[in-house]
A protein has these predicted regions:
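Bacterial N-terminal signal peptides
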Residues: 2-14
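Signal peptide processing junction and immediate N-terminal pro/mature segment
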Residues: 15-19
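Extracytoplasmic metal-acquisition and chelation regions
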Residues: 20-342
Length: 342
């Protein structure tokens, strides 16, 4: 090797690989959104949630510490539908221009998803009514698919270079939801899109029967089949999407009105209804006090089942799939135990 060659090598060193792009910094209001963001983003995102799954998601305090955590976010994800009014205050207080309303980094996970209990008119007399419909959309697995799609679109807006990766991971997640809900064999034969459409219009059972496919239904829907048509009582209107998907009935809530604890008169009305309709299960979220539910159980013999509606180590639920598994299993246990009591 001559001197000129050595000089050339010193002037033009071997090209070094470009450093990997830093992951997107993602902040979510709820841990369930953190899980969906990780499903879609994988190693391309770094995600943190602002709330504790043991907290009522309506009433998180928009503390300065939360604003600080959102200050460097590339993407901010919320459910929307006025579930987390505190989220908007956190964003405004963060001073982060990338995640303000209308910016590419602001993701509303509920966008375009049909809601239940959309009020025809509003009045303070009705309690904490949500003007855009019930916001607890994530407890229907089909809605979780659409929420993940909204999150993927948000990531693609901010990071278009990795669009194909986000779309691939979204497709994988949506297929896993279909398999978990309908059973893998039925999804392979019919396709998740067809099954989801039939389930949304309420005609899945009849359609499967007409096609001779009823025996191939699996997943959560098969496991939860014994719950179909069963009445349960809930504390708040948190479970209506779950009940709609799995065919349960909720004739009354323990709350007299949304956000308003029960009066003695309303509590007595709930006791009467539980006895009249043979309700066996009182389903309550982890952040509500047990007093009213325990009283109803004592008066009627119904079982109180306490479940989280968000995920995290503090509530023993690691993923979205675990969340739905837990509610299905706990209800089956309660209804089975109730049946064995009589």
């Amino acid at each position: 090797m001559n001197i000129l060659h050595l000089v050339a090598l010193s002037l033009f060193p071997a090209a070094q690989p470009a450093p990997a792009a830093a992951p997107l910094k993602v902040v979510t209001t709820l841990s369930i959104l953190k899980d969906l963001a990780r499903e879609v983003g994988g190693d391309l995102v770094q995600v943190e949630s602002l709330s504790d799954p043991r907290e009522d998601p309506h009433y998180v305090q928009p503390r300065p510490t939360l604003m600080t955590r959102a200050r460097e976010a590339d993407v901010f994800i919320e459910i929307g539908l006025q579930l987390e009014l505190w989220g908007g205050k956190v964003v405004e207080g963060s001073g982060n221009p990338k995640i303000q309303s209308g910016q590419p980094g602001r993701v509303i996970a509920s966008a375009g998803i049909p809601t239940l209990e959309l009020p025809q008119q509003l009045s303070r007399e009705w309690g904490d009514v949500h003007p855009f419909g019930n916001p607890h959309i994530w407890l229907d697995p089909l809605n979780a698919k659409d929420m993940a799609a909204n999150i993927a679109q948000g990531f693609e807006r901010v990071d278009p270079a990795h669009k194909s990766e986000y779309e691939e991971r979204l497709k994988s997640f949506q297929t896993r939801i279909d398999n978990a809900l309908f059973g893998e064999a039925l999804v392979k034969e019919v396709g998740g899109r067809q099954l989801a459409r039939r389930a949304r219009d309420g005609g899945l059972d009849n359609w499967l029967k007409d096609k001779g496919l009823s025996d191939k239904l699996g997943g959560w829907l098969k496991r939860a089949a014994p719950l179909k048509g069963r009445p349960i009582v809930t504390y708040h209107k948190s479970q209506i999407y779950f009940a709609e998907r799995f065919g349960l009935k909720i004739p009354i809530e323990i709350e007299e009105k949304p956000g308003i604890p029960p009066s003695a008169r309303h509590r007595d009305a709930v006791v009467e209804l539980i006895k009249k309709q043979g309700v066996k299960t009182i389903l309550e979220e982890v952040f509500y006090e047990r007093g009213a539910a325990d009283y109803l159980a004592k008066e009627t013999g119904a079982h109180v089942v306490v479940v989280p509606i968000d995920i995290g180590p503090d509530v023993g639920i690691a993923t979205y799939f675990d969340l739905i598994d837990n509610v299905v299993n706990r209800l089956l246990e309660s209804e089975g135990a109730a049946a064995g009591d009589h």
